[in-house]
From Swiss-Prot:
This is Homeobox protein 2. SUPFAM superfamilies: Homeodomain-like. Residues 835-865 form a coiled coil. Residues 32-87, 98-130, 163-261, 299-430, 450-464, 609-621, 628-685, 694-737, 752-764, 776-864, 890-927 have a biased composition (Low complexity). It comes from Dictyostelium discoideum (Social amoeba). The lineage of its organism: Eukaryota, Amoebozoa, Evosea, Eumycetozoa, Dictyostelia. Keywords: Coiled coil, Developmental protein, DNA-binding, Homeobox, Nucleus, Transcription, Transcription regulation. PANTHER family: BRAIN-SPECIFIC HOMEOBOX PROTEIN, HOMEOBOX PROTEIN. Residues 485-544 bind DNA. GO terms for biological process: regulation of transcription by RNA polymerase II.
Length: 942
């Protein structure tokens, strides 16, 4: 069986084992694979979801075959990103079988290790396959990696096999990745200095439960996929789908060695005590690391790399070109195209990949993912820069820093360490600007101009830079929010107060010229002088000592200088007493230097304000850029950068970003969300709910950063209008679920539970009627399925994070979800696991409360709904009487199985979803729930 047939079978929704990739690559089958992929990819979003599951599975399967490849591709495509994490041991031109079919079953912790009969252990994927094409033969041994007391992998050493064809001691298995052309630089894998840097795998154990170890599942794969995602995202945001397919195989956490190979081993060590991923210096070792190549043959990986490169070059055309070389790339490109057509469903997936990486960074579930995520974010930023050219590189810059911060990577780059971000300063080097041999990581978005992820890899975990916080407020002289400035404006110096008071005693209605003169002499603004006189007149009036004779018995307009001559000012002291201006001229000469200095300071403040305005236009301060739904949010959504690019193009939400301070999350959803500003609809209670859920949104943005599903969660964040925690169920489904909690009992909300996360953003429709609101919850598990594998635990994290925001139980749920995701992932060896994980993630959204909550709509609600209230509306709409919050909570606390089943509504299909068949998602799409709510039962969940 060749890879083409594997892809074909996987597109049919079959579970196929991830490491069939050792099969030989036959170029004649590429067309068939591309057709299958194209057909599947050209299906509906749900099909795309299923295909994404397949593509994601294919991407995942191919990623299983190509997860490493995607990562490798990212490494290769990123012009050999400094981190070539997943490098296949096979080249496309060679029919070399991968020496390792999969990681050892010891990836999972002892408490969760699969049984001998489980797919993870019994699958031939995990059986070592000798490499038949290397000149030196040897027995390959899979040695279980030691684990710490938490069940997490300790430092791992990986002995890398070196291809006899490699040069400069680089384990590049083929200098030419393209089967068709040996001279095509697009398909050429550089085996020189770009391959020098190593990604030092690591993950933070501080945030993980003893039983949870997302990294042990697909540490390398996730990283690689993230790298691919970065490349693809940077290129098309479509290729991200291809790249995004999470690696379905567990990371090679065990010591893999070849006996009698005579080849020096390449050691990959990851300290477990640090939270931010770090890159080894480019000079540290010239051997490229590709742990996933043991898992997945290098053919697909190289293909994905080509795709990434091609995608980076032509985005889509290159993908087609890559199709000749890459089954997965072609399909993925098609998927990406479909995704772009579908409001970038795949892009959302891509965003999920990036987001997953970002989320992983935040979740520290996959430090490698963190690295990849940073790469993705940076690449996305670069990608945004290329596409948007809206100073996105500046935004990206801030975003990268911001994402790193969000991702717990503390990648804060000081402006002194960052290059000039103007396009003219971008180095034409395909890898990154500056000296490639410099151990100091460089800002990578600058190289994104060439669609390079290397800088991202280099930037991933460099916490040594000086901390730069773009969120720092800029002092503005006219800003009422600045306390110091406010005090300075309102508290006058004694000399100023004396002069103004003396003038006021003579004339309480100075002319415009008088006020201008006072302002200039006192170093005050004209407005400040006018306000002072106005306040003084009001104070005088309150004291009752107003002299009506001076005003002719009528109230004089406060600041109407034009009517000065029309006032009865004949008795004005300034006029009758020779003018008050002389008072200033005759004032103490000692005041002049002080007043002049104040005046100079005033002018400096004005100039400073003007300059800062220009700087702020160039600098995208994330927390100030929410109003810019497309560009700034994308920048803010560095995690969403890929999605943001697509979403930014698609952003139709007027106010969502503003409503949800979820910069990243809102961007994805906002871009696709067509719903009007929720603050415009509903009662003041709904506004208060919005305020409450802005926190959720903020959490969502965190969730977004936390996991791939966060892109979905981003949608969820947008849709996490669901003021009721139970809506948060599904985290993903919540994406579309926007629930307004109005105090009107007649308000009805319809949830079209279409688990198309991608489609959700695209399909989110909200009626303007105050009575009924329809929510199309199109959270296709594409993103989730797409996230299957790498993204799965990310999704779990997202769901968990999401649930964490909503539920107090989130900690337990979070651990359960992550734990389950990892387990499901491990159980299914990746492909099925990805889907299952996605489903599990979507349903692990269980978070036990969230999914259950959501499932409350799906199942628990059904149980709780009186039969007299049931009716039909387009599909199965279920009317739900107001339930006590406690009852709803109980429903939410419903079984996770119910969540899975309820959420999919086609419970069985959910397993299929795990198989990569997004039937459940489709079913979910068909499921619509009508729910009546009141402030007492739903809205008031404090």
């Amino acid at each position: 069986m060749n890879i083409g047939s594997l892809l074909h079978s996987s597109m049919l929704g079959k579970q196929f084992q991830s490491n069939q990739s050792q099969q030989e690559v036959v170029s004649n089958n590429i067309a068939e694979c591309n057709e299958n992929n194209n057909n599947n990819n050209n299906n509906n979003n749900n099909n795309n979801n299923s295909n994404n599951n397949n593509n994601n599975n294919n991407n995942n399967n191919n990623n299983n075959n190509n997860n490493n490849n995607n990562n490798n591709d990212n490494n290769n495509n990123s012009n050999n990103n400094k981190i070539n994490i997943n490098e296949s041991s096979q080249s496309i031109t060679e029919t070399v079988r991968s020496p390792y079919s999969s990681p050892s079953s010891s990836i999972s912790s002892p408490s969760r290790s699969p049984s001998p009969n489980s797919p993870a252990s019994s699958s031939p994927i995990h059986s070592p396959i000798p490499n038949t094409n290397f000149k030196q033969s040897g027995e390959y041994q899979s040695i279980p990696s030691p684990q710490n007391i938490h069940g997490l992998n300790k430092k791992v050493k990986v002995d890398m096999l070196e291809s006899p064809n490699s040069s400069n001691s680089s384990p590049s298995f083929s200098s030419n990745m393209s089967p068709s052309s040996s001279n095509s630089p697009r398909h050429r894998s550089n085996s020189t200095s770009n391959n020098k840097s190593l990604l030092q795998y690591q993950f933070n154990q501080s945030n993980q439960s003893p039983s949870f170890s997302p990294l042990r599942n697909n540490k390398n794969n996730n990283n690689i996929n993230n790298n691919n995602n970065n490349n693809n995202n940077n290129n098309n945001n479509n290729n991200n789908n291809n790249n995004q397919s999470p690696s379905m195989n567990g990371s090679p956490s065990s010591n893999l060695s070849k006996s009698n190979s005579g080849i020096p081993p390449l050691q990959l060590q990851a300290p477990s005590n640090t939270s931010s991923p770090q890159l080894l210096s480019p000079n540290h070792n010239q051997q490229r690391i590709s742990p996933n190549r043991y898992l997945n043959g290098g053919n697909n990986n190289h293909n994905n790399n080509n795709n990434n490169n091609n995608n980076n070059n032509n985005n889509n055309n290159n993908n087609n070109n890559n199709n000749n070389n890459n089954h997965n790339n072609h399909n993925n490109n098609n998927n990406n195209n479909n995704n772009n057509n579908n409001n970038n469903n795949n892009n959302n997936n891509n965003n999920n990949n990036n987001n997953n990486n970002n989320n992983n960074n935040n979740n520290n579930n996959n430090n490698n993912n963190n690295n990849n995520i940073n790469n993705n974010n940076i690449n996305n930023n670069n990608h945004n820069y290329n596409h948007n050219q809206n100073h996105n590189h500046n935004h990206n810059y801030n975003n990268n820093n911001q994402n790193n911060q969000n991702n717990n990577n503390d990648d804060n780059f000081s402006p002194s360490h960052s290059p000039n971000l103007s396009p003219s300063n971008y180095n034409s080097s395909p890898t990154h600007y500056g000296n490639n041999n410099n151990d100091t990581p460089k800002r990578s978005h600058a190289s994104y101009k060439n669609n390079n992820n290397n800088n991202n890899n280099n930037n991933n975990s460099n916490s040594s830079f000086d901390e730069y916080q773009p969120q720092q407020k800029v002092s503005r002289s006219n800003s009422p929010n600045n306390d110091k400035e406010k005090k300075r404006r309102t508290r006058l110096k004694k000399e100023q107060a004396d002069i103004l008071k003396t003038f006021f005693d003579n004339d309480d209605y100075p002319t415009k010229d008088d006020k201008e003169t006072l302002a200039n002499r006192l170093g005050m603004s004209y407005c400040a002088v006018t306000t002072w006189f106005s306040n003084k007149r009001q104070e005088k009036k309150r004291r009752g000592d107003v002299a009506p004779v001076q005003t002719g018995g009528r109230r004089v307009p406060i600041d109407d200088e034009d009517d000065y001559e029309n006032r009865n000012g004949d008795n004005s002291p300034s006029r009758n007493q020779g003018g008050a201006i002389e008072l200033l001229k005759n004032s103490s000469s000692g005041l002049t230097p002080i007043l002049e200095s104040l005046n100079v300071k005033q002018q400096n403040n004005i100039n400073f304000f003007k300059n800062n305005n220009m700087d702020n236009n160039n600098k995208n301060v994330p927390h100030l850029s929410l109003s810019n739904n497309n560009n700034n949010n994308n920048n803010n959504n560095n995690n969403n950068n890929n999605n943001n690019n697509n979403n930014n193009n698609n952003n139709r939400n007027r106010n969502n970003n503003n409503i949800y301070n979820n910069n990243n999350n809102n961007n994805n959803n906002n871009s696709n969300n067509r719903g009007k500003n929720f603050s415009d609809s509903g009662s003041s209670d709904s506004d208060s709910e919005l305020n409450r859920h802005n926190n959720n949104n903020n959490n969502n943005s965190n969730n977004y950063n936390n996991g791939n599903s966060n892109s979905n969660n981003n949608r969820n964040n947008n849709n996490n209008y669901n003021y009721n925690n139970y809506i948060n169920n599904n985290n993903y489904n919540n994406n579309n679920n926007r629930q307004h909690c109005d105090d009107e009992e007649e308000d009805e909300q319809y949830f079209n539970n279409n688990n198309n996360n991608n489609n959700n953003n695209n399909n989110n429709r909200i009626s303007d009627s105050s009575d009924d609101q329809y929510f199309s919850d199109d959270t296709n598990n594409n993103n989730d399925n797409y996230n299957n594998g790498n993204n799965n635990y990310n999704n779990n994290n997202n769901n968990n994070n999401f649930n964490n925001n909503y539920m107090n139980n989130y900690n337990n749920n979070y651990n359960n979800n992550n734990y389950n995701n990892n387990n499901s992932y491990n159980n299914s060896n990746g492909n099925n696991n990805f889907n299952n994980n996605n489903n599990n993630n979507n349903q692990n959204n269980n978070n036990n409360n969230n999914n259950n909550q959501y499932n409350n709509n799906n199942k628990n609600y059904l149980n709780n709904i009186p039969s007299s209230k049931k009716h039909q509306l387009q599909g199965n709409y279920e009317r739900r009487n107001s339930l006590p919050n406690s009852q709803i909570q109980n429903n939410f606390n419903g079984d996770n199985n119910n969540n899975n089943n309820n959420k999919n509504n086609n419970n069985n299909n959910q397993n299929n979803n795990g198989n990569g068949n997004n039937n459940n998602n489709n079913n979910n799409d068909n499921n619509i729930y009508k729910r009546r709510h009141s402030m007492d039962d739903d809205c008031q969940q404090n």
